[in-house]
């Protein structure tokens, strides 16, 4: 039996008293996290490689008001664990000069705290958070999908003035019945996915309309005076538009990945390096050292499309669902020339340009759709790698 972590998100509307308690919990969690960040800022590889980090007990002794907080003590410990994860990510990715832990702010659009020692029972249609925080009403449409006895932890989150309770369950997920399909997938900018069956899949038009809504609200924000009440109100509207876009894209990716996993036993994909693919265009200089045209505007537009379409999120969903449901997902090398190889005779068309969507093989004369041909080659190469590994 293999247990998996599965989350369920339940929106709720707290009472005025409960909302005030939750806001204090968010603030206390931020305080504990920021104390860790402040200690980390004293870190120096040469002079102070091991700064002293305060623990929960020490912070409660030094700050009596924290001892009376309605937040569960376990949630304060989880704030320290979250900081340690952020610190580990920083040291792991320090070569990029990013991901340094930063102070949490009360102005962040997302506020949350997590309790890993939950109550595993229901009071009718209400879930009790704790004695001090009270309970949350769960509506019929949000009824629990898994037994409450399997609850692992819960998180209360406020995102753009909307509260939600995220329940994390330990669930035994059974593999699905064996499917017959074997496909290759080519990710693209013009179409989100091209399958080796010839099917091309793109995001629905509604997603593009939501993107236009974000741009429109962002333009309005740029005209507001920073720090004014109008600016703060418009910033909340922009954050809400971004959240709506993100949730819609995430939901579409879940539906699409579920369908591909349901229909196919074997899936072949490219190995993606999104960080490298979305770098700026290299500078080009002429003989006199003056800058030349380097296609930076087109490269910038392509980078926006790659990041907007959320390739990494879709690949992650396919990966964990394939593992859950007993499917085989193989990723081919990122330098494999899937678009340039003729699927019928194996000839390599070295002069293929990005603007050429269709091409004819010089050796066998068979016409190819660039993306469908790439998906077929990815499928065959993934099958070959799978046989070698077996």
PLM features per residue range, with description:
Residues 1-77:
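Gly/serine-rich nucleotide phosphate-binding loop at the start of the catalytic core
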Residues 6, 16, 20, 31, ...:
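Positively charged, helix-rich recognition surfaces that bind polyanionic ligands
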Residues 7-9, 114, 124, 133, ...:
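Broad gene-expression machinery/nucleic-acid interaction feature
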Residues 8-12, 136-142, 146, 201-203:
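Generic detection of short hydrophobic beta-strand segments and adjacent strand-loop junctions
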Residues 30-40, 79-87, 214, 319:
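Short, Φ-rich (hydrophobic/aromatic) sequence segments
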Residues 36, 79-90, 372-382, 386:
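Stable alpha-helical structural segments in soluble proteins, enriched in small hydrophobic residues
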Residues 37, 41-44, 87, 91-98, ...:
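Long, hydrophobic, amphipathic alpha-helical segments used as structural scaffolds
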Residues 53-157, 292, 298, 304, ...:
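Acidic carboxylate diad motif detector
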């Amino acid at each position: 039996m293999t247990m998996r972590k599965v989350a369920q998100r339940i929106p709720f509307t707290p009472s005025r008293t409960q909302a005030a308690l939750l806001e204090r919990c968010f603030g206390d969690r931020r305080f504990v996290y920021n104390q860790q960040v402040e200690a980390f800022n004293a870190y120096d590889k040469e002079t102070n490689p091991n700064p002293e980090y305060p623990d929960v007990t020490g912070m409660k002794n030094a700050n009596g008001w924290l001892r009376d907080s309605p937040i569960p003590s376990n949630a304060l410990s989880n704030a320290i664990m979250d900081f340690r994860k952020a610190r580990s990510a920083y040291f792991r990715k320090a070569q990029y000069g990013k991901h340094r832990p930063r102070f949490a702010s009360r102005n962040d659009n997302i506020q949350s705290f997590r309790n890993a020692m939950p109550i595993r029972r229901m009071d009718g249609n209400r879930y009790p958070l704790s004695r001090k925080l009270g309970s949350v009403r769960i509506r019929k449409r949000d009824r629990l999908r898994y037994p409450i006895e399997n609850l692992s932890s819960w998180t209360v989150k406020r995102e753009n003035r909307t509260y939600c309770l995220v329940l994390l369950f330990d669930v035994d997920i059974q593999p699905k019945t064996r499917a017959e399909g074997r496909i290759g997938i080519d990710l693209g900018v013009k179409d989100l996915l091209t399958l080796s069956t010839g099917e091309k899949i793109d995001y629905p038009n509604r997603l593009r309309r939501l993107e236009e809504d974000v741009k429109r609200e962002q333009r309005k924000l740029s005209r507001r005076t920073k720090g004014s009440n109008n600016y703060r109100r418009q910033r909340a509207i922009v954050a809400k538009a971004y959240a709506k876009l993100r949730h819609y894209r995430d939901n579409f990716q879940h539906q699409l990945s579920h369908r591909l996993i349901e229909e196919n036993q074997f899936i072949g994909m490219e190995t993606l390096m999104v960080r490298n693919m979305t770098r700026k265009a290299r500078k080009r200089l002429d003989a006199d050292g003056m800058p030349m045209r380097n296609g930076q505007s087109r490269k910038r537009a392509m980078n926006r499309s790659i990041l907007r379409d959320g390739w990494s999120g879709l690949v992650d969903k396919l990966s964990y669902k394939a593992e859950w449901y007993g499917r085989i997902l193989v990723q081919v090398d990122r330098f494999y020339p899937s678009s340039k190889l003729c699927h019928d005779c194996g000839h390599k068309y070295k002069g293929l340009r990005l603007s050429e969507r269709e091409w004819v093989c010089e050796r066998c004369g068979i016409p190819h759709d660039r993306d469908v041909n790439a998906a077929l080659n990815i499928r065959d190469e993934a099958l070959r790698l799978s046989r070698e590994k077996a």
